Amino acid sequence: MSALPAGTAPPDAHYRYVLRLADTSLILGQRLSAWIGHAPALEEDLGLANLALDLIGQARLLLTYAAELEGRGRDEDALAFLRDAPEFSNLALAELPNGDFGQTIVRQWLLDAWQLEMYAALATSSDLRLAAIAGKALKETRYHYRFSSGWLLRLGDGTAESQARAQRALDDLWRFTSEFFTPDEIDTHMQTLGVAPALAPLAARWSQRIAADIAAATLRHPQTQPYPWHGKRGVHTEHLGHLLSEMQHLPRTYAGVQW
């Protein structure tokens, strides 16, 4: 992409756009799966596990479609397990460590609200395959958002300790949200084709939803200035490499192995 004139979409823009959606779900699902057996209570353990399974299921559908769009003979497993960190294009927020339960909930809530708007818009995409995937994912994401926003309310309007942890997580993670609705040449090109939605209306609805949830949870809206992260362009934090080294260990150690 760096060799192209500024603002010019690459020839494989469609593939890259679908891959971004896939990678965000895959990496977030991988992060959530680390809570299995470690959540504060059995109900939350099962809840987070179900969210992780849904996200990985979404990623599989999107990765399979991305592989077909790429047309290089790769499949969902090759895209998931045989790419290096700079080749991933997930939103940077998804790759951040789980931290405590409060940080996990705040991260999940921010991304659930984003996916809720994104999948609702993509369900009417001119790309019928992508629209079908988005329609299925939207049903799951509604549940994800109810789970995370419900827990945000409990934490924010709970004890002094839970509120402090939720507020700290919100302040720390807020700067990563600027990437959600900052369009680049791929977003713009896909929008002109009717594949992707315009991001400005989504940003307005997301902001309204987030502000209402923050107020309901008796939290303060962050004053942190957003930072222009570029996870969807392959620029990541150091945390993604550590996550991938664990996630990809078996396929890379035993190449081509079949169960």
Short names for language-model regions:
Residues 93-147:
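Internal, conserved structured core segments that host functional sites
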Residues 13-18, 39-58, 104, 129-141:
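Alpha-helical scaffold segments that form or flank carboxylate-/histidine-based iron centers
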Residues 2-17, 82-108, 155-162, 173-196:
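Acidic/His metal-coordination segments adjacent to aromatic residues that form catalytic metal sites
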Residues 24-32, 58, 62, 111-118, ...:
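Amphipathic, well-ordered alpha-helical segments in soluble domains
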